Structures are given as structure tokens and as C-alpha cells.
Amino acid sequence: MSSVPVIILHQPKRLIVGAGTIGEVCTWAGEVSSTLVIATPITAGFVDRLKLPGKVAVFDAIPGEPEIATLDAALAAARAAKPDLVVGLGGGSVMDVAKLLAALWDSEQTLADVAGSNKVAGRSTRLAQIATTAGTGSEAGIRSLITDPIKGAKIAVESPHLIADLAVLDAELTYSVPPVVTAATGVDAMAHCVEAFTSKRAHPMIDGFARMGFHLVGKYLARAVKDGSDHEAREGLMLASYYGGICLGPVNTAAGHAIAYPLGTLLHLPHGLANAIVFPHVLAFNEPVAQEKTAEVAQALGLGHGLSQAKLRAEALGFCADLGIEMSLAKHGATEADLPRFAADAHAIRRLMDNNPADMSVDDVLGIYRASF
């Protein structure tokens, strides 16, 4: 008799969900002498809603794919501010930087020291994560990704010391997210759930979160793209994103994200868009070895029942394209000459590729890029 694999599930110490709940942060924070908010120029517009006491500094120079230099600049800002509270106010890039900042600003450890799993020595600064997009689910997790532009690769840091003390899911903060960004980040949230659900490392407990996540995306993503102020849809996607973030902890993603990463580091596509472009092709590739679970995903997304591999790919492509996502790599500036480098880099990301239900050769990965071209 096989036993259920042992997993450790980390979640934020406190989670607040609901409209207007950004206003609850000040009550939770209590007496704070110095706060550093990590944001983008757009999300910095929400800082006043925090109503935090004491000194509040804002670092808003966070690009779509934060690099080592981004983290270094944020660390310099933190050492000047000496915060007793760090707030990540934004999407995944913002929250990933906030995690590392809270752990490293007053530490002798560097990014190189903590790269990998369970190398962060500790954290003395409180961390609040406030999601302003529904995609990465970074507010739920213990991982942070920073791009090394010289190597063209992502540096992954995983540690329970990166988990938030407080996470806030306030769907009102997502009303102004443009339709095309809503679409791409929504597919990213779905991909987290689907990749964990079909993974070689799938776990029955995480399957429950994954199911809730991709069902919510199937129900609400098109609605939110059509009407950004549809609160029910926006809130459903925030929950889907959070559930996807939970999936990343003990199970993680697989080939889909590995194949998407070079599109961010080398082609400089936003993370959600990169994942959306490859999602239909990876879903179809894995179908022969994950038939029951793939069929469940297809049903939840309204793709149909009893689909052939080719029909599944076509329907999933249609699902993404109907959301307004441009699904051609060529249209995003890629050339055919780029594809072998993308494939080699993606195939080398073994921490994700080894989770995939179907083994992929470099040629298989190249085939997915060509199908996406």
C-alpha cells in the first residue's frame, strides 16, 4: 500500500480577503517607526490607502523582470530607511523583491549566499504582501525569482523565512489592470494550478487547491477581461492566484514554466504572457500521460470533453487567443534563430523540467517553441 508523500505547507501567518482590505494593514501593523514599500510607479498610487504611522519610504523602480541590480538598489534604499516593516505592493515581481529585501537588508548574507533551497539564515523584519494583480500568487509563497542578465537565467531562492506575516487580497486594487494583462496573468495563475495538478510530484492535498484555482479561472477570467470592474470575477481570480501560489510551495511548476523562463530572460516578455503562449502546447504534450487530469482541466476551462491531443491544443489556443492574447512568438519579436538557445536554456532548468509528467528532450522543447512561433 502506497503512502501519501510527506509535504510541508507554508502559508502567511495572517490572510485578509475582501474589498477595501488594504485599509486593514495599518491596524495589523500597529506602532511602526519606519516602513519601506516596494512598488511600481503605478502601484505606488495605493500607498496612501495604507495609512501607516511613522516614516514611509517608497522604492518603485521595479521592472517586469527584476534583475540583480534591481535587488541591489532596493537593498540600498532599505539600508537608508532601516525599516521595521517591509510592504510589497504590486504583482509578483514586486513581491519577490520585497521577500528578499525583508530577509537581507540587515543581514550579512548576499543573494549568492541564499540562492537555492533553505539557505536564508532568518528574518527580523516584518513583511506584508498586498497583491495588485491576480497571477503569480507570490503573496502565498516562500520563493523569490531574480534574473541574472549576464547568464540570462533566473536565480531561485526558497525559504520559509520568505513567507509573509500578512497577505492581503483586495480585489479593488485590480480594477485598473488592463484587459491584456488581466488575461495573461490569469493564464499564469491557471498554469501554476495545472502544472502542479499534473506534476510527477502531485499531492492529493495540493490537488484540492489546484482544482479550486483552475475552476475559478475557467469561470471568471473571460468576465474580468471583458469588464475590469466586475468585482465577483476579480475576487475569484485573486483567490485562484492565491491557490496557485500555494501549489508552488510543496509541488511547484513543471515544463510550462521552464519553457516560459527564457522568453522572459532573453526575449523580455512579461512572465504571464510568456506562460500563456506556451500553455496550450505543454498541456497537449502532457495529455497522453496525464489523461484524466488533463480532461478535468479541459472541462473546467470549457474546452470540451473527449478531445484528441490536436483538438485539445487547438481549443486551448483558442481559449487564450479569445482573451486577447497574441499567441505568436514571432509577433513578439522572436526569430527562428532564437529558438535553439531558448530550448537549450529551458531544458537545463531541471528543478522544473524533472517535475513534468512527460519526459521532454531538447528537441521536444524546441518543437514547442516552433509550434508557438
Task: State where each predicted segment sits.
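Short, amphipathic C-terminal "tail helix"
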Residues: 336-373
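N-terminal small/polar loop signature for handling phosphorylated ligands or for N-terminal nucleophile
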Residues: 45-113, 118-119, 222-234
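Glycine-rich phosphate/diphosphate-binding loops and the adjacent beta-loop-alpha structural elements
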Residues: 195-250, 261-264
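Gly/Pro-rich interdomain helix-loop hinge
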Residues: 266-338
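Glycine-rich phosphate/pyrophosphate-binding beta-alpha loops
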Residues: 135, 242-275, 350-355
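A glycine/threonine-rich phosphate-anchoring loop and its flanking beta-alpha core
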Residues: 13, 23, 106-202, 293-296, ...
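ATP/NTP phosphate-donor binding region
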Residues: 1-85, 329
